[in-house]
Structures are given as C-alpha cells and as structure tokens.
Amino acid sequence: MMMIIDCHGHYTVLPKAHDEWREQQKAAFKAGQPAPPYPEISDDEIRETIEANQLRLIKERGADMTIFSPRASAMAPHVGDQSVAVPWAQACNNLIARVVDLFPETFAGVCMLPQSPEADMTSSIAELERCVNELGFIGCNLNPDPGGGHFKHPPLTDRFWYPFYEKMVELDVPAMIHVSGSCNPAMHATGAYYLAADTIAFMQLLQGNLFADFPTLRFIIPHGGGAVPYHWGRFRGLADMLKQPSLDTLLMNNVFFDTCVYHQPGINLLADVIDNKNILFGSEMVGAVRGIDPTTGHYFDDTKRYIDALDISDQERHAIFEGNTRRVFPRLDAKLKARGL
C-alpha cells in the first residue's frame, strides 16, 4: 500500500493569540522594551485551526501525511535581531511540535531557524539540535537570504554555512531551501521572490562543489525548483562552460525538487525533465495560491491530481508520493517503520 506524503506544508492559519503576540513582540523591540510573555494557547485552539484547514484538505484530497513547518512568509528573520528571532523561532517551532503531538499520524515537524541577517549560524545550530533531539523534528527550512529580498548573504557554497551543514550531517536531516517574506518593494514574495530564490540557490550550488565536502547533505528546492526545470538546458550548458561535471554528477545526488507547481503542464514538464528519483510530492496547501482554477474547477494547489494524471509507471508514482521522501528524510522513514509502515 502506497502512502501519500506531502513534503511541503506550512502552518498558515494559526491561533489568533500567536499572531497577536508576534505583533506585540515587534512593537516591544521597536520601543526598546522586553517582549510580553508568550500566551497560553489551548489544544482545542490548535485543533480548530488544523481540523478546519490542512487536516480537512489532506483527507479530502486523499493524502496521508504532511511534513509541517511554520508559516514561511512569517519566519521573517530580518525583523529585529537575535533577541527577536530566537524566541520567535522557538515559539513557532513549539507550536508545530504541539500539532504533531495532537495529530502524530498525519504530521511530521520541520523547523524554522533564527537566521538574523547580522548573525552567524550559532543560534540556528542550537535551534536545529533542540527541534530534532527534543521535539522529534525530521528536517529544517534553511533561508539562503535572511535579509528578505536583497541577497547580501554569502552563497550556499560559502564556508559561512559549513558549521550548520556539519550539524545537519551529524543529525542526518535535510533542509528545504526556503526564503521568507520580501521587504524589497520590487519583489513580490510568492510570485517573484520565492521562485527567484529557488533558482538562485540552484545556480549557487552549480557554481561550487559543496557536495564534495558534504556528500550526504540533502537539499529540497521547493516550488518545483523555481525556473530550473524549464531552463534545464541552460543550466547544463552553464555547467559545461564553467568546467563543472554534469549536473547529474555534481548536484542531483543531493538536490531534490518538490511538486508545488500549480498546473498540469508544469508538472508534466517537471516529470519529463527531472529524474524521477529527484522529485518529491508537495503541495504547500493553504499557502501561496489558495483559489480554484477556473479552467479545471479544482484548487490550484491540489497537486496530487497532477501527479495522478502523469503518464508514468506505478513504481515512478510511488517514488514521488512516498519512496523519495522517505529516502530524503530518514528520520521520517524511521518513525514510519516504527509504526509498521
């Protein structure tokens, strides 16, 4: 029996008190005052937000499990400094842990990181360790541009990131490369910034040789890999011009794309261009695009329909829906095996 595992979910409709505390935290930082205590949020409040949104859609669309992380647009590491980013990340990750505890058969946790633009990765390493070792999380979201749309951080191949990669390898967890909200008025967050960052991340990796130093490091580039599959020939050609090995050798044992692509022709192209072993089912439901496609009558983000419609073998479909995700997230695989799955 095949499981349908969605590798890309965010907690986008949250208890009101959580969002209110965030606004209070930001206001307190601006005023030079300590943030108020985090509010008490009941299990029932969490259940209400999940049952009315992600859990309902998971059941309606025929999936089994979602890998769940904090709301991407609200990670906002560019707000404040480490005194803001660390407690915010902890609060968001703790909320994800509570969702997983309430619905352990349906959700697995992935953490956000307190990546203030001026900070090194020390606090992020500590939060990753806490979330994996204490909360049972299976991965993280790594922001390649904590400044929010100006791309001033070193490329992902730079040694700035190496201490964090070392911890990822030690814990055997992957990272989804995921930016947050845009503070650049020329760059719409979900329509421009997300897709640009996905593409930029891939090109950064192409220009270096990161996986020679970290052969077991694993990255998921979301939103179908940005522009990469559509311009696969360009990237193959650039690798050749830069005297790099082929993409299959240089990157594609370590880099994976999800299926957060919101129309059938786009998914068809992804599956045609990218090797089956590198594609993970994802939807980012109740996320960037929440409406119904008037040409199909179905939600744009109901990506399972697109995978179901692909002209591929049952074995290839199983790999996209389950097998690849269990391979990329070995801690999830261990949890499922412990349940006899």
Curated annotation (Swiss-Prot):
InterPro entries tied to this protein: ACMSD (IPR032465), Amidohydro-rel (IPR006680), Metal_Hydrolase (IPR032466)
Domain of life (superkingdom): Bacteria
Active site: E284 (proton donor/acceptor)
Keywords: Aromatic hydrocarbons catabolism, Lyase, Metal-binding, Zinc
Keyword Metal-binding attributed: yes
Record's cofactor remark: Binds 1 zinc ion per subunit. The metal center contained within the active site of LigJ is not used to activate the water molecule but is utilized to activate the substrate via polarization of the carbonyl oxygen.
Example of a GO MF term: carboxy-lyase activity
Pfam hit, one: Amidohydro_2
Pathway recorded for this protein: Secondary metabolite metabolism; lignin degradation
Effect on the protein of changing H223N: 91-fold reduction in catalytic rate. 30-fold decrease in affinity for the substrate KCH
Cofactor: Zn(2+)
Catalytic activity: (3Z)-2-oxo-4-carboxy-3-hexenedioate + H2O = (2S)-2-hydroxy-4-oxobutane-1,2,4-tricarboxylate
Binding locations of Zn(2+): H8, H10, H178
GO biological process: lignin catabolic process
Deleted gene: phenotype: Cells lacking this gene catabolize vanillate and syringate with an accumulation of the enol form of oxalomesaconate (OMA), 2-pyrone-4,6-dicarboxylate (PDC), and a product that is likely to be KCH.
EC number(s) given by UniProt: 4.2.1.-
Binding site for substrate: R71, A72, S73, Y194, H223, R290
Record has Secreted as a keyword: no
Cellular component per GO, a single term: cytoplasm
Quaternary organization: Homodimer.
Entry similarity comment: Belongs to the metallo-dependent hydrolases superfamily.
Function as written in the Swiss-Prot or TrEMBL entry: Contributes to the degradation of lignin at the level of the protocatechuate 4,5-cleavage pathway. Catalyzes the hydration of the double bond of (3Z)-2-keto-4-carboxy-3-hexenedioate (KCH) to (4S)-4-carboxy-4-hydroxy-2-oxoadipate (CHA, also named (2S)-2-hydroxy-4-oxobutane-1,2,4-tricarboxylate). Is involved in the catabolism of both vanillate and syringate.
Name under which the protein is recorded: 2-keto-4-carboxy-3-hexenedioate hydratase
